[in-house]
Amino acid sequence: KYDFIVVGSGLFGIYASLDLNKKGYKVLLIDKEKFPYKKASIVNQARVHRGYHYPRSVTTALASNDFSERFIKEHSDFINNKFSHFYGIDRFGSLTNANEFVRFADFLGLDYEETRINAPFSNQRLEALFKVQEYSFDPFLFREFYLHILNKTKVETKYSTFIKSAEKGVNTWKLKLINFDKDEIFVECTNLINSTYASINEINR
């Protein structure tokens, strides 16, 4: 029986597993991929979100911005801030116009500078273009760094494994896992954390 089972071995899943292990909990980390850190953490999360792209959700943007400085400080060796980052507001198809973006950024205290450049942007198509402070990071260095730490802990891992069924009891979760060899594995945990991204609704159902 585990204190926590964490589903999804991307940045959030590994980070949560390490933090829980540090606090003395028995943790199992599972992922349907053969290797950890292969999906959204590389494809979608390879930049430090500060909230600029959430103008329709102030709560989400605020949370992103609040934690960005801590994230940058803890991972400074992997951060790339040597480039210019722009957000363009489409004149015809955007659900947010330039004035709304400015009000949103001002409300959150996000830095921006309205600007105008040529290629690769179509200035005829854009209502406004903003230069902002938002950095990227190297996801492969992240993976190497965190897996090195993970392998030194007591966190148990099961890759090529997915949840076939989950049953919530009074104080525990009972899970049936299946790996790529079609082996069935039955495990129990007190707490279940879903840190997937692309398959989050598939698991929640």
Predicted regions span which residues?
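Hydrophobic anchor at the start of a short beta-strand
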Residues: 25-27, 112, 192
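Dinucleotide-binding Rossmann-like beta1-alpha1 core, especially the glycine-rich loop
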Residues: 45-120, 125-128
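Helical element adjacent to the flavin cofactor pocket in flavoenzyme catalytic cores
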Residues: 130-191, 195-202
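Conserved Rossmann-like nucleotide-cofactor binding loop
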Residues: 12, 35, 199
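Active-site substrate-recognition segment that forms the wall
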Residues: 15-19, 48, 73, 77-82, ...
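N-terminal Rossmann-like FAD-binding beta1-loop-alpha1 element of flavoenzymes
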Residues: 2-28
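Anion (oxyanion) recognition and catalysis
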Residues: 21, 106, 151
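Glycine-rich FAD pyrophosphate-binding loop
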Residues: 21-42
